[in-house]
Amino acid sequence: MEYKAPSTAAITAEIEAQVIADGWMKACGGDTAYQIIKDRLQVYLRRPDDANFEQIYHCAHELSYPFPLTEGAMNEFRPLLTALIEPLDPRALRALCGKITDVIYSRFSAACDDNPLSLTPLAAFIEKVRRTHVTRIYTTNYDDFILQAAPDLYTGFANVPAAGPQQFELREFWERRDDGSVFYLHGSVHLGFPHPMPEGSEIGDLHWFHARDEARKHARFDGSDVSRMDGAQIMRTSVVTGLDKLSRLQQRPMSHYYAALAADLMQADIIYVIGSGLTDLHLNSWLREARSLSPAVPLLFIDYWNGHFLEATAFDAQRKEILLFHELRVYAKGPFGGVRVGDHWTLSPDGTSAIWDNGFQHFLAAQDELDEILSRMKSVA
C-alpha cells in the first residue's frame, strides 16, 4: 500500500463504481447482483464498511453454479449447495465475477507505473538478504514492485524480455531451488491466458507476459472451469481473489509455488513476514508448522501499529494479534511479555521472533536496527 497499490477499501470502491457504470453489467444483471450481495452482507456483517470486494466475489462465485440439472446428471456434477439456496441468476453472477477480476487486474497493473516512492531501499534490502541467504520471496500481491527492485529474481518463467507469452518451466522450477526467486502465490499482473494457445501448452495454462499491457489483453479466461469435489467448479483467473483461495491454487503455476512454499518454510534459516494481515489461512498453516519445529524457525514480523507494539496491543487484541500469537507462535505479549529493543522492535522472550511496528518504509530505512535485532535472536544462521 505504501507504493500506492490500492487498499482493500479503495479497490472495493473502484470495483463498485465500474460495475454500476458498465453497460454489459446493466444488460446482464451483474450490477443488480452486486447490489443485492453487498446490501445483504452489510446487514449481516452489521457495519456497512465491512463488506469488501473479496467477500462479494466469494459470494458471487459460490452462488454462480446452482444451474438447472438434467434428470440423468451424475451426483458428482450436482453442486450440493443448490439444494439449500434460492439462487440469483448464475449468468449475472458469472459476469460479475469476471468484471471484478478485470478491475483488480487493470487497477493493480496501472499502480505499477504510478509508484511515487523510490524502490532503491527495497532493492538494497533484497540484496542484503541475498548476500547471506538463498532468498525465496512469496508474495500475495499482484503488482511487480519486487521485480522492479530486483529484476533478476526467478519467477518460474524464463527471465528474458520475450515478446510473446512464456510457459512455466515445470522441470527447471524444481531444479533452481538455490536461485533468488519471487513467486506470485495469488497471481500477477504479468500472468494471462494467451490465445491462440502456444504449442505444447494445455487448456487453462497461465503464461507470463513480459509486458503488462500485453498480459492485460489476456487476463480473462473464457473457456471451461475446474471441477471441485462438491460438484461445483472454479473459474480460471489470472489473479486469485475471494475468500476460498486454496482451491484456486491448484492451477499451474500456483500449485508449484504453494508446494515449494511448504518446503522452503520448513527448511528456512529465517522467515520475514511483511505487511500481512494473516487472513490467508492456507499460508498461516505452513507458517505455524515452521514455527512448531524444535528449535523454531526464527521469524521477523514487519507491520504497522499505532504506537509501540506492546503499548498498542496491551488491552486490545484483534484478529491479527491473536493469530500472531497462536498460529505463528510469536509470544511477545500477554503473560509472556516482550522485550522492547530500540524504538520500534519487540523481541519475544524466547528470542525466536521479533516484531517491527513502524511500517515497511521505516523498516527499510532502519537496517542498523535490523542488524541489532538479528544479533539478539536465537538460531539465526
Predicted features, each with a name:
Residues 1-17, 25-32, 37-38, 47, ...:
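SIR2/sirtuin-family catalytic core signature
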Residues 1-148, 152-157:
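Gly/serine-rich nucleotide phosphate-binding loop at the start of the catalytic core
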Residues 87-116, 148-259:
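Active-site gating loop/helix substructures
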Residues 121-130, 166-171, 284-286:
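Short alpha-helical segments and helix-capping/turn motifs at coil-helix boundaries
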Residues 132-134, 179, 268:
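Short, well-ordered alpha-helix to beta-strand connector turns
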Residues 136-138, 181-185, 272, 300:
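Hydrophobic/aromatic beta-strand patches that form the interior of the parallel beta-sheet core
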Residues 142-144, 186-189, 278, 303-306:
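Short, flexible loop/turn elements at secondary-structure junctions
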Residues 147-149, 194-195, 282-284, 311:
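Short glycine-/acidic-enriched loop or helix-start segments at secondary-structure transitions
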